[in-house]
Amino acid sequence: MNNNKVYSLNVVSFEKIIFNDFVKKIQVSGSEGELGIYPGHLQLLSLIKPGPLLILDDHDYQHVIYISGGIIEVQPTVVSILADTAIRGLDLDLNVVLDKKLKLENKISNVDCIDRNDVIQQLSCELAKLRVIEMFKNQYIKKNN
């Protein structure tokens, strides 16, 4: 392993360690836009928006993880992500996500909805999960063709 071409990535949620390995690059949605983190990246501290975390590990295998939000800290040889919630693409259930999305859409259309912004935020998270499921599915299809 050439240390100039990889760095250590730690992804943890409040419940458990999701990922801890050497990687070549990651891509995640930061508070100010998309972040592509490569070896030797400048130090950085940023909020993370809900969406996919794309990882290319040191064996050229791609991982897709849903992040509901959190913080990323970039150091010269280590990147740490503390996620509010983190779920591997493999563990997301399409039917559960679609069902929750439909319920939230119906709730938004209800004019009596008390906290519309909260429902919109929840819907945004479900849409991000759907993007992760789609990315995982596409990655699986490419790998098996």
Swiss-Prot record:
Keyword Phosphoprotein: no
Gene Ontology molecular functions: ATP binding; proton-transporting ATP synthase activity, rotational mechanism
Record-level GO cellular component terms: plasma membrane; proton-transporting ATP synthase complex
Subcellular localization: Cell membrane
InterPro entries, A to Z: ATP_synth_F1_dsu/esu, ATP_synth_F1_dsu/esu_N, ATPsynth_dsu/esu_N
Keywords (A to Z) from UniProt: ATP synthesis, Cell membrane, CF(1), Hydrogen ion transport, Ion transport, Membrane, Transport
This protein's record includes keyword Cell membrane: yes
Pfam families (alphabetical): ATP-synt_DE_N
Membrane topology: Peripheral membrane protein
Lineage: superkingdom: Bacteria
Main subcellular location: membrane
PANTHER family to which the protein is assigned, alphabetical: ATP SYNTHASE DELTA/EPSILON CHAIN, ATP SYNTHASE EPSILON CHAIN, CHLOROPLASTIC
Similarity comment: family membership: Belongs to the ATPase epsilon chain family.
Function statement: Produces ATP from ADP in the presence of a proton gradient across the membrane.
Subunit comment: F-type ATPases have 2 components, CF(1) - the catalytic core - and CF(0) - the membrane proton channel. CF(1) has five subunits: alpha(3), beta(3), gamma(1), delta(1), epsilon(1). CF(0) has three main subunits: a, b and c.
Protein known as: ATP synthase epsilon chain
Organism: Buchnera aphidicola subsp. Baizongia pistaciae (strain Bp)
Gene encoding the protein: atpC
